[in-house]
A protein has these predicted regions:
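Helix-adjacent hinge/juxtasegments
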Residues: 13, 17-56
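Long amphipathic alpha-helical segments
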Residues: 53-58, 91-95
Length: 116
């Protein structure tokens, strides 16, 4: 979950054209999950704002230097990255015959329903 939050943070940082910085958490904190969920809430709100902006060329810094890409491509990559991890979770659960967790309940539609 830390990886997912950190990656979401970086995608948001790029879209908001903020300077590169790493997102770090106290891995030993008893509040780690709550802190991650709180961070995701803020990240999600920032990403939602990006949807309303015109597509544009975004220049951003990575650990490997400066890059430039359309905002729509960055958003697409973020979605593909999330989907990749979703598939990995399903494969890991399936390998161990764990089927009582329905990932459809954790889809964006399920998330939006939970907010009502």
């Amino acid at each position: 979950m830390v990886h997912i939050v950190a990656a979401s943070y970086l995608y948001g940082q790029r879209l908001e054209e903020k300077p590169f910085s790493k997102f770090e958490f106290d891995m030993d904190s008893q509040d780690l999950i709550d802190n991650l969920l709180s961070a995701l809430d803020g990240i999600d709100n920032g990403l939602i704002e990006q949807v309303y902006k015109e597509d544009r060329e975004v220049t951003y810094e990575t650990s490997k230097g400066m890059r430039s890409q359309k905002a729509s491509v960055i958003l697409s990559m973020m979605i593909f990255h999330t989907t990749e991890h979703r598939a990995q979770i399903v494969a890991a659960l399936d390998k161990h015959n764990v089927r009582e967790i329905n990932l459809d309940h954790y889809s964006i539609f399920g998330y939006l329903e939970s907010l009502k």
